[in-house]
UniProtKB/Swiss-Prot annotation:
It comes from Serratia proteamaculans (strain 568). The active site is at residues 72, 141, 143, 148. HAMAP family: GlcN6P_deamin. GO terms for biological process: carbohydrate metabolic process; glucosamine catabolic process; N-acetylglucosamine catabolic process; N-acetylneuraminate catabolic process. Pathway: Amino-sugar metabolism; N-acetylneuraminate degradation; D-fructose 6-phosphate from N-acetylneuraminate: step 5/5. This is Glucosamine-6-phosphate deaminase. The keyword Hydrolase applies. Keywords: Allosteric enzyme, Carbohydrate metabolism, Hydrolase. InterPro entries: Glc/Gal-6P_isomerase, Glucosamine6P_isomerase, Glucosamine6P_isomerase_CS, NagB/RpiA_transferase-like. NCBIfam families: nagB, PRK00443.1-5.
Amino acid sequence: MRLIPLKDTAQVGKWAARHIVQRINAFKPTAERPFVLGLPTGGTPLEAYKHLIAMHKAGEVSFKHVVTFNMDEYVGLPQEHPESYHTFMYRNFFDHVDIPSENINLLNGNAPDVDAECRQYEAKIKSYGKINLFMGGVGIDGHIAFNEPASSLASRTRIKTLTEDTRIANSRFFGGDVSLVPKFALTVGVGTLLDAEEVMILVTGHAKAQALEAAVEGNINHMWTISCLQLHAKAVVVCDEPSTMELKVKTVKYFRELEAESVKSL
């Protein structure tokens, strides 16, 4: 595992965006051989999306031959709802870059048969071989995507019941009213994430410190699904200073020395 300890949220977003651009450009994608990118929603990746848009506008990257798969979507929330993840992605990223609409894959939380929707999503991912890079965030309780505590580490895309803690955390997007937050979501599984060639998780804020500790220094444990990163051959965790507060000083020092070159010019 790589741990990239940075100063603040702005640096986390910049490092993540720069890493994605480097990966896309090194891959040299074409229409026949696109780069497959997994994407999250929520507050954490917003800085990364801002930097990706800026780098695209500066001519440093094109998304013309990039195919995206999003992590999750609420069940029962209309697609046009301001807090649907469909709306979020277009508002904060897709509308500002040159990605063709046919290359965008989002789970349909209003599908008449959600189980079939999840199976088709998995099949479409497999049709591209694999996801080259999956970017994600983490919840206070250590969940990645909507793989809540006690999710199977072999799980695939499916419907999940959201915990009360997750709904309370997400109520900030619904005017603070928990009753407006959907109780169910479709989400890629832990196994789906582990199948990606590379997984990059962004961790920001002191509230995520316990989750980061579980990911880096804890045991592999389905109660902290982020700990599954320890099983991945190419996992990258990009974090800000407040989120490292539960890590041992020597752990942060070790990774800071290892990654000194990669964080230059941020």
